[in-house]
A protein has these predicted regions:
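Metallo-beta-lactamase
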Residues: 181-238, 351-362
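Sec-dependent N-terminal signal peptides
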Residues: 4-14
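Cap/insert and terminal regions of metallo-dependent hydrolase folds
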Residues: 156, 244-248, 256-360
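Zn-dependent metallo-beta-lactamase
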Residues: 21-120, 211-227
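Active-site metal-binding motif and surrounding structural segment of the metallo-beta-lactamase
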Residues: 136-190, 267-281
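Divalent metal-coordination and catalytic microenvironments
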Residues: 117, 127, 144, 161, ...
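Conserved beta-strand hairpin/beta-sheet module of binuclear metal-dependent hydrolase folds
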Residues: 96-147, 231, 235-250
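Charged, glycine/proline-rich intrinsically disordered loops and linkers
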Residues: 39-76, 170-181, 287-310
Length: 369
């Protein structure tokens, strides 16, 4: 029965994609005027955007991708059922090994993500940072050493999506692989979960499009398609069911969008969604390393009509409406204004994400000794 449903889903999506193309992907006069205005008034956009392709073609493909991704999302949400065997963990500890902000001069920050997650059953490495200097040891490995963490301590690795700031550097992206330093080391007998077909020497990474349990009380929430003007990416997040609390959703970049992360989690888990922690890509203003071009990578948004403060405020209100009790926003892809908006709303229930600072659900943040 499940195979028939999957086949039917594929047929429906294909038909919708054809309908979308038949409606016309050629830019309207208004759309072309918006693109031309951006190219003529924003030198950074005019210089950088051709590196991704012809601007008109990018826009036309983006229009197709929006319809296709929405159709896939609706079909997946209809198809997916509740995970019956998620289980629970009494232990939840998360340590940002790489993130955008560090308050310790001995621990490197960079515009990337790598989180260590400990539960009763497993130690999980979620993403592997950016490695800006392309060095060995990488900032990730140096931070791990200073925190007393070894690669041998890690049982499971999960990659959220194939962007350079999550797979260990841009050079690995076209190869559909990843690395914890500037060359690929022996990872031993780790189980690795990826959001698209990826490889690693000596390993067989597991690609599961649908949600999958990876340890007792821990699962991925499945792949969600994320259409952006300059590219398309598939991203997955991790969910941890903590005893006495509920499900904590941990996101890498949040290209899925906050609303879809919540909707998917509420769809597949019978337990309440307790918290949302990680990267959510909310670059409204320029701050630290968050530059204007970060706004070009917002899912479903045009570079000249990108995320606004009102959008962020709506996300805050949505999480409160859904009774999400704790929130923590990564500084690697969100600006200070967005972080402060969530801090103001959540107050003592807001979790600061600083490199090396341990997060537990008993005490929201304490220094890892």
């Amino acid at each position: 029965m499940k195979k028939h449903l999957i086949l039917l889903t594929g047929i429906v999506i294909s038909c919708l994609a054809v309908i979308a193309q038949n409606k016309g992907t050629t830019l309207t006069e208004k759309e072309r005027a918006g693109l031309d205005h951006m190219l003529s008034t924003d030198p950074m956009f005019a210089q950088l955007i051709p590196q991704f392709g012809d601007p008109v073609t990018l826009y036309e493909n983006f229009k197709i991708d929006l319809v296709r991704s929405d159709s896939i999302w609706e079909a997946d949400q209809e198809r997916l059922g509740v995970m019956q065997n998620l289980g629970v963990t009494e232990t939840f500890e998360m340590v940002p090994l790489i993130d955008g902000i560090s308050q310790d001069s001995d621990l490197a920050a960079e515009p990337g993500v790598s989180y260590l997650i400990r539960t009763d059953e497993a130690t999980i490495l979620f993403d592997v940072g950016l490695n800006v200097p392309d060095s060995d040891p990488s900032p990730l490995l140096r931070n791990m050493e200073r925190l007393g963490i070894q690669m041998e301590d890690i049982d499971i690795m999960v990659i959220s999506h194939n962007h350079g700031d999550h797979v260990g550097g841009q050079k690995w992206v076209p190869q559909h692989t990843f690395s914890v330093t500037n060359h690929q080391i022996d990872l031993g007998e780790k189980t690795i979960y990826v959001p698209e077909p990826m490889t690693y020497p000596g390993q067989e990474p597991i690609y599961s499009y649908d949600p999958v349990k990876i340890a007792e009380g821990v699962a991925t929430i499945g792949v969600i398609h994320c259409p952006m003007f300059v590219s398309h990416v598939q991203e997955q997040a991790i969910a941890v069911n903590v005893k006495g609390k509920g499900v904590v959703v941990i996101s890498g970049c949040g290209h899925q969008t906050i609303d879809k992360l919540v909707e998917r989690s509420e769809k597949i888990f019978k337990e309440p969604i307790y918290g949302l922690i990680g990267g959510f890509h909310l670059p409204v203003t320029e701050s630290r390393h968050i530059m204007r071009y970060y706004g070009w990578m917002v899912t479903g948004k045009l570079p000249w009509a990108t995320l606004t403060k009102e959008d962020v405020e709506q996300y805050v209100a949505m999480l409160q409406d859904h009774h999400i009790e704790v929130v923590g926003i990564s500084g690697h892809d969100s600006c200070d204004w967005s972080i402060e908006a969530f801090k103001k709303a959540y107050r003592e229930h807001y979790i600061d994400l600083y490199v090396g600072e341990r997060i537990t659900l008993g005490t929201l943040a304490s220094k890892l000794l």
